[in-house]
Amino acid sequence: MIIMALNCGSSSVKYQLFDWDKKVVVAKGMVERVIVGDSYIVHEVPGRDNYKLEQDCPDHRAAIDLVIRTVTDRECGVLQSVAEISAVGHRVVHGGEKFTCSVRIDDDVLNAVKDVQHLAPLHNPPNIEGIEAARALMPAIPHVAIFDTAFHQTMPEHAFLYPVPYDWYENHGVRRYGFHGTSHLYVSKRAAMLLGKPAEQCNIITMHIGNGVSHCAIKGGVSVDTTMGLTPLEGAVMGTRSGDIDPAIPAFMMQKENLSAKEIDSVLNKKSGILGITGRYTDRRDVIEHAAKGDHRCQLALDIEAYRLKKYIGAYMAAIGKLDAVVFTAGVGEMGAAIREKAIEGLEHIGIHLDRERNAGAMTRKRESLITTDDSPVKVYVIPTDEELVFTEDVVAILNGTYTDHMQFEYSFAKPDFVRT
């Protein structure tokens, strides 16, 4: 059984083909610069040289058509025909309150996703375009939607509601939704496995740190709070996003610099965070390198990021009670030993005893690592995320009629005999 995972961004289409029977990725890749011009595909097959082809893709349909032609190409492909694909899983960033789990896509589901696209105007429209294009190009194949927000639909009202006029929530859906749900789900299940306890008996803080950053408080195996809010802008310091700031700052700066609402939104989403502080960098490797050379603003960016990480660990520990583990994941979380160290050093009083040697050695995206001492009351793990595996398992279970929701479904990666491929 071959499952295709699609992730359609504003100017890109990521894809992966997973052989469910053999439990291996058979191909993956990305079409970049969709719509904007000079588009190209990079196609990766294990054991082969990467394949790159430049081809104009004026829209997502053209990009997905290029993906299909590439994966079925006689020379660089891995399939004889698109009919070998059993189903397609689509990442959808925002499902609003309607979608609490992954669902098979029909016209009603697609219309419901369109109804909430105003909540994610940068992300849902390309997701929708990708779904429409893929359904048109592969009409005989089942399509499934996997929502970034679904994992967080277990949050209680006191965690997801903002202290603003209640009719904003009733009339416009203004509340905390949270994102990166599939990543938080995967690493929390793996952490429970490493702890040797059922997920429903674990209290875990998961820290997804890439260019986008979100943290999640998981109590008894379910999300009870998360840092991102109505949009992915709230919360931790990110590569280009500000995260938490005084809500009065946008209006203040709009007046001071005569900025429109659209312009201030762009500044907070695309010109703030690590980039805003350093003035030059979003890649933490560049920031760490130049901080070591004495660049004050790079050092300041690292200090601010680590300080905010530490604050959220403390806040979420207070919210969920006795803490079993903290998990770092995603690009920076998995590879940024220096940032991890700054975030968790000095937390011995709350039961976190960092092993600096272990932390320094956990610089790979292929291995799960414990970075605290053996006797640390709270364990800290580095766990490479695998959102595509969550996509695949949800799709297969929906096809087989065995899927209920992410809380009750027994994922293969939550079992003792799981081996990461």
UniProtKB/Swiss-Prot annotation:
Primary subcellular site in the record, as a coarse category: cytoplasm
Marked site (Transition state stabilizer) residue numbers: 180, 241
Alphabetical list of SUPFAM superfamilies matching this protein: Actin-like ATPase domain (SSF53067)
Subunit record text: Homodimer.
Function: Catalyzes the formation of acetyl phosphate from acetate and ATP. Can also catalyze the reverse reaction.
PANTHER family: ACETATE KINASE (PTHR21060), ACETATE KINASE-RELATED (PTHR21060:SF15)
Protein name: Acetate kinase
Gene source species: Trichlorobacter lovleyi (strain ATCC BAA-1151 / DSM 17278 / SZ) (Geobacter lovleyi)
This protein's encoding gene: ackA
